[in-house]
Amino acid sequence: MLAAALRAAGVDVSGWSQTGQYALWLVAMAVLALILVSFGAVISGMTVWWEMRVSARMQSRIGYNRVGAAGFFQWIADAVKLLLKEDLIPADADRLLFRAAPYFVLVGFALVFVALPFGESLIAADLNVGIFYITAVTALVVVGILVAGWSSNSKWALFGGMRSAAQVISYEIPAGLAVMVPVLMSGTLSMQGIIRSQGAWPWEWHALTNPFAMVAFAIFFVAQLAEGNRTPFDLPEAESELVAGYLSEYSAFRFALFFLVEFGNLWVMSAISVTLFFGGWQVPFAGPEVFAAARGAGDLPGLAWWGLQLASMLVFVAKTLVLLNVVVWVRWTLPRIRVDQMMSLCWKYLVPFAFVCFVATLLWQILVARVPATAPVVGGLMLVAAIVAGFSFLRLTRRNISAVGDRVDFTNW
């Protein structure tokens, strides 16, 4: 693709030496890495703004409204403020590890975007083991958190790091078993392959074509909340118990890196869920043959192909925002649970249910999925059930609001 772009720009690369082509590849990889980190930072900042606006709406207050329209650029002001603060390192801290810990976390976060498909061709690397790669690189985040807690030479930071390590290691098991459900349904570990095995319509998504896949999604979603240290699983940063947990001794730029990753993970976990269970970037009325026809036979694709790529990205972002709202809703609704409750939930409930979903999906694929027209029929029935459940929930919510004499205030949005 890079060589094709250079040829289209009038650059003849046929006579370049092997060293020159290798140097060009290194430059391209460096630019790609910079783009990924910058993109992750922008995603994190916009997620902060979105959560603050949604949480303000939920609590009938204004929220961000000073810097930019509807406070949209407030996250930039916050980032500049953190960058200009004094960077303090405790006198008794392990200075090398204290400095390195935020970069472990940042690298683990940024590497996820390599295999995350934002569109039909909008992916840095379509790895044939994409979901396995994402599971592996996200483990770097907990390494950084544990190193941050240890190197701070503070009991509160150490307790926070140890809690995070125990939490992530425990919830990786149900998350991994839940991920195996869409892998079994699609027959591939590739993120793009998992998306292409689904369809654009809701009754073609993995979450609705198999009753056990919806349960697997719920397990995966809860496990991702725990791995991301989100309420009600924010025990590593519990202010009432550990000051700020592993972040207690961090300030300025290094604190900003942790902050960036924490909010960026909200987007990542929602995007992974959309990819595995909700059809990813699939665009209605635009199947693979439409993308292939728009691509054409030339070195560089035409305008129609780029339009389809934009449409697929918008579909992916819209689905991700829906799940992101659910994450925000959970945070501002549920209280923090205790450590023993967190571990009991994982080992006594999520792990057994995830294993049952895995085995049941195995049997479903062998005995039921091969029957013609099974997927659309099951998908349609589950879609109707989901719509009925959603309207029932909204009706119950409206009844509860009326019963207590409360009102929904739209004036502050």
From Swiss-Prot:
Membrane topology, as annotated: Multi-pass membrane protein
One family name in Pfam for this protein: NADHdh
Family: Belongs to the complex I subunit 1 family.
Transmembrane regions listed in the UniProt entry: 23-43, 104-124, 129-149, 175-195, 205-225, 258-278, 310-330, 349-369, 374-394
Top-level enzyme category: translocase
PROSITE patterns: COMPLEX1_ND1_1, COMPLEX1_ND1_2
Record keywords, A-Z: Cell inner membrane, Cell membrane, Membrane, NAD, Quinone, Translocase, Transmembrane, Transmembrane helix, Ubiquinone
Keyword Thylakoid: no
GO cellular component: plasma membrane
UniProt gene name: nuoH
Known role: NDH-1 shuttles electrons from NADH, via FMN and iron-sulfur (Fe-S) centers, to quinones in the respiratory chain. The immediate electron acceptor for the enzyme in this species is believed to be ubiquinone. Couples the redox reaction to proton translocation (for every two electrons transferred, four hydrogen ions are translocated across the cytoplasmic membrane), and thus conserves the redox energy in a proton gradient. This subunit may bind ubiquinone.
Catalytic reactions of this protein: a quinone + NADH + 5 H(+)(in) = a quinol + NAD(+) + 4 H(+)(out)
Record InterPro entries: NADH_UbQ_OxRdtase_su1/FPO, NADH_UbQ_OxRdtase_su1_CS
Protein name: NADH-quinone oxidoreductase subunit H
Subunit and partners: NDH-1 is composed of 14 different subunits. Subunits NuoA, H, J, K, L, M, N constitute the membrane sector of the complex.
Subcellular localization: Cell inner membrane
